[in-house]
From Swiss-Prot:
Official protein name in the record: Large ribosomal subunit protein bL20
UniProt keyword annotations, A-Z: Ribonucleoprotein, Ribosomal protein, RNA-binding, rRNA-binding
Record-stated family: Belongs to the bacterial ribosomal protein bL20 family.
GO MF terms held by the record: rRNA binding; structural constituent of ribosome
NCBIfam families (alphabetical): rplT_bact
GO CC list: ribonucleoprotein complex; ribosome
CDD domains the record matches: Ribosomal_L20
């Protein structure tokens, strides 16, 4: 029996057009441009997942540095002091403390200061 490919082609087209929902113009309506746009968007999404980790780490370091400098200590000295004191808090938590719980962060800065000086 002869196999025609209309069903599978239609399903494939539908899959890409579903993924292209919300794109502007022909990118959401025309199969070929929609497929190209979707494939490119998936590449950007993959790259973005890697960049997000780097960006958040940068943001956390920036916030910790700003909080530490308010109390007269640099980021690197603070991290060294906390390490010497045996305080193992990650940058995400430290940044959270620096922004939302300034008193607790100030105590950590004092501990780090005592270790460094």
């Amino acid at each position: 029996m002869r196999v025609k490919r209309g069903f599978s082609a239609h399903r494939r087209h539908k899959k890409y057009l579903e993924m292209a929902k919300g794109f502007r113009g022909g990118r959401s309506r025309l199969y070929r441009t929609a497929r190209e746009a979707v494939e490119r968007s998936l590449v950007y999404a993959y790259i973005g997942r890697k960049q997000r980790k780097r960006e958040f780490r940068k943001l956390w370091i920036l916030r910790i540095n700003a909080g530490a400098r308010e109390h007269g200590l640099s980021y690197s000295k603070m991290m060294a002091g906390l390490s010497q004191a045996g305080i193992m808090l990650n940058r995400k938590i430290l940044a959270e403390l620096a922004v939302k719980q300034k008193e607790d962060f100030a105590k950590l800065v004092e501990i780090a200061k005592n270790q460094v000086h």
